[in-house]
From Swiss-Prot:
This is Cell surface glycoprotein MUC18. The chain crosses the membrane at residues 564-584. GO terms for biological process: angiogenesis; cell adhesion; glomerular filtration; heterophilic cell-cell adhesion via plasma membrane cell adhesion molecules; positive regulation of cell migration; vascular wound healing. InterPro entries: CD80_C2-set, Ig-like_dom, Ig-like_dom_sf, Ig-like_fold, Ig_I-set, Ig_sub, Ig_sub2, Ig_V-set.
Length: 648
């Protein structure tokens, strides 16, 4: 080959190399087209289309690739309209939808957020890229406040709270709020530090720590965090619960607090405590002014720093003061003195202390008491509670025996409800013993054990004796009254003689006779309310009008068993009589039902053996008292017994 030809070949080769190196317009590499964006939530199915939604063409012959590190990895083939999975991580999650142009990816995970390529074997169809974006809502955020507390005097930022949002994708955004207002980064005031952790599932766990310098006004501040995230459906957010953080600050003021609030009285349970406007509460001491020296002396308190007055008394009144010591700042504060007033009523005194008076004379009773408040006095009868008068003096004129007994003087403070004191005084009216009845009957059964009671009143206090043997017990309802109960066996001798109780004192005596009546089958007692038993009888002084003594009635002997026996016997007698009449009628000895009439002559009517005693336990309003030494006078209520005869 000649030299010219070699030169031409060399130049041609050089030109080709230069053209290849420099590039030729029209032969540049085609850029990657903008991919279609497909969004799906974790766990759902993503639909990947091989071309725009309105694109037309034959997609019966396509290949699907995964773009990974600029490499194309075949994952699925479509041949003649049928899908064929390729081995790999997507082998069991890919399938064709209704259209061969749509590839379905099931059970989407965060790892599926990649670029996919669809290549058609038809020359007219271009390569189509699909970008899959995956989303997952985080769980409800949790927040943990600083439980140790933050002191306002600290200059450095202290951790306020920590917010955690788990299992979200992509990483959510966190916002902090105080009292519903968003917090922003502020130098030397607010700092927010967030970090993320990638779980094995590909999801993110976000942790955000809020640090700040707090002030006293933040003691009740509400802090919470908010997570903002996006889903295919749009933007969303989740809020944590609100928390408060203990804020410590020194006290500026201390004061005394007393419970209960209001007027106090002796006997109340009173609690004295110290309080400040600081947090935490400092150490307290409670001092009380000594009235004799004028100095403040420390009082003994419990482990909580409380001074308990249980019960409150008069000497607890006085000036109290609190002192606080802040161990953090070593500052001592004192409260204003508080005057504690315990209202009281002193012991009540009645003069004379043991009054005695003759019947018909007058008596003056005086009541005295002391209090720091205005007093009111009231006089009452102890037994009945009857109000006799108001004022410190009670005047009794032309007294009778019924005026004897106990009187109550009550001194009260109207301004302080429940504050009062009382004193009893026993008034003695000289006189011989008196009783309600001269004679009383009681129905008994032979060989039964009977309790007989006898009551008498007088001044001096009488004594009671019995004319029969038995076990007697006594008790005194009041200084002028005595009640004696005799336990005795009912014998024929006792039925014949009865029982007598005699009350006597230095001024005379009085006697009540108890007549015992034996209950038999022929004795009926029609009204059990009049004679109510077989075991007990009470004989007591009768109460006059306006009297202050009360008659004590004990149960009387019962006769229900006897009445039942009598009814049964009568029923049996009637049954036998009816049977006899029926027998004679059947034998034809009775003219009943025949034409002949015969007169039946009855025997003469005889008096019934049944006697019913009608008794009354109620005595007249006014009854003459039985006078012992002045002669025996029958009580108006004892007018003899009334009988109703039952005849055939």
């Amino acid at each position: 080959m000649g030299l010219p030809k070699l030169v031409c070949v060399f130049l041609f080769a050089a030109c080709c190399c230069c053209r290849r190196a420099a590039g030729v317009p029209g032969e540049e590499k085609q850029p990657v087209p903008t991919p279609d964006l497909v969004e799906a939530e974790v766990g759902s199915t993503a639909l990947l289309k091989c071309g725009p939604s309105r694109a037309s063409g034959n997609f019966s012959q396509v290949d699907w690739f995964l773009i990974h590190k600029e490499r194309q990895i075949l994952i699925f083939r479509v041949h003649q309209g049928k899908g064929q999975r390729e081995p790999g991580e997507y082998e069991h999650r890919l399938s064709l939808q209704d259209s061969v142009a749509t590839l379905a990816l099931s059970h989407v995970t965060p790892h599926d957020e990649r670029m996919f390529l669809c290549k058609s074997k038809r020359p007219r169809l271009q390569d189509h890229y699909v970008e899959l974006q995956v989303f997952k809502a985080p769980e409800e955020p949790t927040i943990q406040a600083n439980v140790v507390g933050i002191h306002v005097d600290r200059q450095e930022l202290r951790e306020v709270a920590t917010c955690v949002g788990r299992n979200g994708y992509p990483i959510p955004q966190v916002l902090w709020y105080k009292n519903s207002l968003p917090l922003q980064e502020e130098e030397n005031r607010v700092h927010i530090q967030s970090s993320q952790i990638v779980e094995s599932s590909g999801l993110y766990t976000l942790k955000s720590v809020l640090s700040a310098r707090l002030v006293k006004e933040d003691k009740d501040a509400q802090f919470y965090c908010e997570l903002s995230y996006r889903l295919p459906s749009g933007n969303h957010m989740k809020e944590s619960k609100e928390v408060t953080v203990p804020v410590f600050y020194p006290a500026e003021k201390v004061w005394v607090e007393v419970e209960p609030v209001g007027l106090l009285k002796e006997g109340d349970h009173v609690t004295i405590r110290c309080l400040t406007d600081g947090n935490p509460q400092p150490h307290f001491t409670i001092n009380k002014k000594d009235p004799s020296t004028g100095e403040m002396e420390e009082e003994s308190t419990d482990e909580n720093g409380l001074l308990s007055l249980e019960p409150a008394e008069k000497h607890h009144s006085g000036l109290y003061q609190c002192q606080s010591l802040d161990l953090e700042t070593t500052i001592t504060l004192s409260s204003d003195p508080l005057e504690l007033l315990v209202n009281y009523v002193s012991d009540v005194q009645v003069n004379p202390t043991a009054p005695e008076v003759q019947e018909g004379e007058s008596l003056t009773l005086t009541c005295e008491a002391e209090s720091n408040q205005d007093l009111e006095f009231e006089w009452l009868r102890d037994k009945t509670g009857q109000l006799l008068g108001k004022g410190p003096v009670l005047q009794l004129n032309n007294v009778r025996r019924e005026a004897g007994g106990r009187y109550l003087c009550m001194a009260s403070v109207p301004r302080v409800p429940g504050l009062n004191r009382t004193q009893l005084v026993s008034v003695g009216i000289f006189g011989s013993p008196w009783m309600a009845l001269k004679e009383r009957k009681v129905w008994v059964q032979e060989n039964a054990v009977l309790n007989l009671s006898c009551e008498a009143s007088g001044h001096p206090q009488p004594t009671i004796s019995w004319n029969v043997n038995g076990s007697a017990t006594e008790w005194n309802p009041d200084p002028q009254t005595v009640v004696s109960t005799l336990n005795v066996l009912v014998t024929p001798e006792l039925l014949e003689t009865g029982a007598e109780c005699t009350a006597s004192n230095s001024l005379g005596s009085n006697t009540t006779t108890i007549v015992l009546k034996l209950v038999t089958l022929t004795t009926l007692i029609p009204d059990s309310s009049q004679t109510t038993g077989l075991s007990t009888l009470t004989v007591s002084p009768h109460t006059r009008a306006n009297s202050t003594s009360t008659e004590k009635k004990l149960p009387q002997p019962e006769s229900k068993g006897v009445v039942i026996v009598a009814v049964i016997v009568c029923t049996l007698v009637l049954a036998v009589l009816g049977a006899a009449l029926y027998f004679f009628y059947k034998k034809g000895k009775l003219p009943c039902g025949r034409s002949g009439k015969q007169e039946i002559t009855l025997p003469p009517t005889r008096k019934s053996e049944f006697v019913v005693e009608v008794k009354s336990d109620k005595l007249p309003e006014e009854m003459a008292l039985l006078q012992g030494s002045n002669g025996d006078k029958r009580a108006p209520g004892d007018q003899g017994e009334k009988y109703i005869d039952l005849r055939h």
